[in-house]
Amino acid sequence: MAAPQGGYPPQEGYGQPAAYGSPTQQQAPTPVQHGGKKKRAYAGEAFEFGSGANAALGGQLPAGGSYGAYPQQQAGYQQPAAYGADPAQAYAAPAAPGVAQMTQQFGAMGMTDPHLLPPQPAPQAPQAPRTVPLNQLYPTDLLSQPFNVAELDYPPPPIVLPPGTSVYPSPYANCPPKYVRSTLNAVPTTHSLLKKSKLPFALVIQPYAALHDSEDPIPVIPDQVISRCRRCRSYINPFVTFLDHGHRWRCNMCNLTNDVPQAFDWDTALQKPADRSLRPDLNHSVVEFVAPQEYMVRPPQPLVYLFLIDVSYASVTNGLLATSARCIKESLDRIPNADRRTRLGFIAVDSSLHYFSIPRDGSENSNPQMLVVSDLDEPFLPIPGDLLVTLSECRENIESFLDKLQEMFQNTQNNGCAMGSALRAGYKLIAPVGGKMTVLSSSLPNVGHGALTMREDKKVLGTSKESSLLQTANSFYKSFAVECSKAQVSVDMFLFSSQYQDVASLSNLPRYTGGQTYFYPGWNAARGEDAIKFAREFSDYLSSEIGLEAVLRVRATTGLRMNTFYGNFFNRSSDLCAFPAFPRDQAYVVEVAIDETITRPVVCLQTAVLHTTCNGERRIRVLTLALPTTQNLADVYASADQQAIATYFSHKAVERALGSGLEPAREALQSKIVELLATYRKELAGGSVSGGGLQFPANLRGLPVLFLAMIKNLGLRKSAQIPTDMRSAALCLLSTLPLPLLMQYIYPKMYSLHDMPDVAGLPDEKTGEIVLPPPVNLSSERVVPYGLYLIDDGQTQFLWVGRDAVPQLVLDVFGLPDKSQLRVGKQNLPDLDNDFNQRVRAVVEKSRDHRSKGVGSIVVPHLYVVKEDGEPGLRLWAQTMFVEDRADQSVSLVQWMGSLREKV
């Protein structure tokens, strides 16, 4: 890989080859104004330098020598004299030196992107000679060159390997960052150097980048010839070396020489010799092997879904029972069933357990039978034979059962919910085969096993005692989860209560079984937006090609050891993570220890996931990452990945919050960022305080902002207003979201819509992907009173309508003559016959597009319309997204940087 270009930030982030991906989201290039017909811009000074919110378009000069030396803001934001006075220019043309001219000037300087500006700070001299220079360190001052949100879209610092590291020169030889990211892309050779750096060494692993294989295909090796090292059991990969005329290979992890299997160079399909240099496992770092018999303890299990549906009064009245029954029925074709072995079962739960035996299609009696069990202490299985039925054999009867299920309980007055007992009963039913228990509930489990009580106390919120509410109230939920894990049973929770439901306790079941907690506070099917959101998400959930009976292990070069694992699974032994089901919408963090001095120029870390596909095939997904080593602290800092580091500390903060409390978690985050800044200043900035600044390398400039945003996140922030269930659900997200979604959840995306560039909201000519406007920093200083903004944290979207928004804007976007008629709250945007409405809708939809971020997710965020001068509660909620502002018991970004400067 070529050495990175000088100057920060160089083109494409850090001079990284295209194979490793520049920012996934297509950012809008700046429009060049021509004399022809002009697109509408709804702003007063749409592109005026320093005004408006379009930071990345020029209001804010990002990273570069003079980052963020903002020109003075205009005094107030004058509204244009007359909107649409000139019919040719429907909404006031942009004034002043349009960014267009600047773009042309920068273009002449070879800098087509306005956020890649001159002059560069001088790179630091490396301390030790290398065959290939690693990334250079670019010092910057965080105070005089403020953070620009566009920096969060840069790819990680490139992984610079010596030439000839891989056995064949394949562009796919090293693992792409969407699957595995290391916090350090240059690894210290000793434990003492790592300790001196104060940086963490960890991997962020996301083995799947989509819910379905077809959306993210990787090479599959079907010949069942799997070559592994005899000693360390690593899989053959692009970084091994061949010896003895290719008859033996040396392991790149432990150096042992192994024999090449006889069938390695034989094409079983064509029955003739094959070209070894074309084998996927020697060219691709991400591959999947079809596993032979010896990788199975038992025949591959079928896909099993057991639905535990709350049918108590709360669940019938809010429409959950009817909506989930209808949604399962409509999704039967989407549930993976290629091998025709998929099985389904249903248990309805109130103060009793209701089992359903569903006959095969074409039987004499096609009516489902309901069997009620009221003994909750030892729930027995009535007739286990046909309680779990094969989908393809009972399809019609399953449909008619789901139609009837809604009616069976429509007049119930039963407020009991024996979900703990139902889980025990469900476990007995599916433990022999393993599978998924999907819980759909609107109530607190209040009778039977694992009964819980209302323990939330408003007086405790915001105090040190609040932490006890985030811990499990009943040991059943942890001990039962471990039992489930051993029997290959996974639990997913869909929770819908409008009252306290104890998410803190219930979320333990998914946490230890490879499941997930999905939380829908105050959900009601009578609101169309609620019903549609859940139906879309639940249908995608059922269609997801999950893995079954899976284990994950990470192996590495001698001298490295996997130390701690974070994520939703059960840690079965020191280095083995067990997943009864392997989801496709989660990421995992593994901390790596350096136990002995590393003498090699390159280390490798290999993740392997052994699993059964939902089509009954045993497979191993292998992801191999090679990283250069260094004895030089400057190299370690210059190659550190700020987003991977933030992900690691997000998991650490959740662990600390659940173990010690929220205040210790927040304090730990603050003291960590202070420690990193102080270490950098002392070791690499020569201890000098140049003009009272705050020095940090260019590639880590976002870290102080991300740490502040974490401290302000719903899961961790200091507040007496946050319901415990909301907080617990947020902690679940902070410890499971894939990296791109976690970054957005911590530091949401904000787009200025009223003055978006001409190309935004339209398909890109080359890729066909909708172009998003440039993101804007999350500060109210960036928001103009006549503006329209989209704020999106990946879970919720807000459409912010400024108090002085002009009538034409309201008419074009919402189809209403006057802002006073605009209803606030949850809604879908109307589909109107005008260009601007279509572009706004396209941006809202594209912002939800998980696939373009390289992740699998079922979440469809709600869209809330917020008026700046409208309903105060909603406005305050939206304003919590402005993480750079001062808020309830928390500091602004400027104050935060000032306090960091004092502490350093």
Swiss-Prot record:
One Gene Ontology cellular component: COPII vesicle coat
Q: What membrane topology is given?
A: Peripheral membrane protein
What intrachain disulfides are recorded?
none
- Lineage, top-rank taxon, reads Eukaryota
| Compartment(s) where it occurs, according to its Swiss-Prot or TrEMBL record | Cytoplasm; Cytoplasmic vesicle, COPII-coated vesicle membrane; Endoplasmic reticulum membrane; Golgi apparatus membrane
Protein's GO biological process: COPII-coated vesicle cargo loading; intracellular protein transport
Q: Where does Zn(2+) bind?
A: C229, C232, C251, C254
Cited Gene3D superfamilies: beta-sandwich domain of Sec23/24, Sec23/Sec24 helical domain, Severin, von Willebrand factor, type A domain, Zn-finger domain of Sec23/24
Identify the Pfam families for this entry: Gelsolin, Sec23_BS, Sec23_helical, Sec23_trunk, zf-Sec23_Sec24
Protein's UniProt keywords contain Oxidoreductase = no
Feature: compositional bias, Low complexity: 1-18
Q: Tell me the segments the record calls region Zinc finger-like.
A: 229-254
**UniProt keyword list:** Cytoplasm, Cytoplasmic vesicle, Endoplasmic reticulum, ER-Golgi transport, Golgi apparatus, Membrane, Metal-binding, Protein transport, Transport, Zinc
Outline the segment boundaries, as ranges, of region: Disordered.
1-39
Report a single Gene Ontology molecular function: SNARE binding
What is the annotated role of this protein in its UniProt record? Answer: Component of the coat protein complex II (COPII) which promotes the formation of transport vesicles from the endoplasmic reticulum (ER). The coat has two main functions, the physical deformation of the endoplasmic reticulum membrane into vesicles and the selection of cargo molecules.
Subunit structure of this entry? The COPII coat is composed of at least 5 proteins: the sec23/24 complex, the sec13/31 complex, and the protein sar1. Golgi apparatus membrane; Peripheral membrane protein; Cytoplasmic side.
Protein name from the UniProt record: Protein transport protein sec24
Q: Name the gene behind this protein.
A: sec24
